[in-house]
């Protein structure tokens, strides 16, 4: 087979929604830690309080519990957070967010849903942020 007929394959580095959120939070001035863990016996990932993948804090003392997913799964993750007693307790004094990532062309975009909780119900405030490229997020 000649060099002219060989197909060149460029490996694209896949980046997870969790890594995208970690990089994005850093650019927003937060330090963050992944708090979900792999349970090798059950062969599942286990989140903090069954809903929090990342905990982030900034210099002002804002403390966020973040559930990370793809844009397509936001509604199911919001329901998961809404039903979680741990998330309710967390949200009484801190922030809970769901980050949903989607690649639009060459750029990653994130939809952020903030949970506002009072003793009667959880309410959601949605914000969209655009312009995070995978190259930028990976740095």
Model-derived regions: residue spans:
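Catalytic phosphate/metal-binding cores of nucleic-acid and nucleotide-processing enzymes, i.e., regions
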Residues: 2-139
């Amino acid at each position: 087979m000649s060099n002219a007929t060989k197909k060149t394959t460029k490996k694209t580095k896949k980046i997870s929604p969790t890594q995208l959120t970690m990089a994005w939070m850093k650019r927003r001035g937060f330090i963050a830690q992944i708090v979900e863990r792999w349970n090798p016996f059950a062969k599942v990932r286990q989140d903090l309080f069954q809903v929090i993948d990342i905990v982030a804090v900034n210099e002002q003392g804002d403390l966020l519990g973040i559930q990370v997913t793809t844009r397509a799964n936001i509604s199911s993750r919001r329901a998961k957070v809404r039903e979680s007693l741990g998330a309710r307790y967390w949200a009484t004094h801190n922030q809970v967010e769901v980050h949903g990532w989607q690649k639009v062309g060459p750029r990653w975009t994130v939809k952020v849903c903030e949970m506002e909780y009072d003793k009667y119900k959880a309410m959601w405030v949605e914000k969209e942020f655009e312009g995070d490229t995978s190259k930028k997020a990976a740095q």
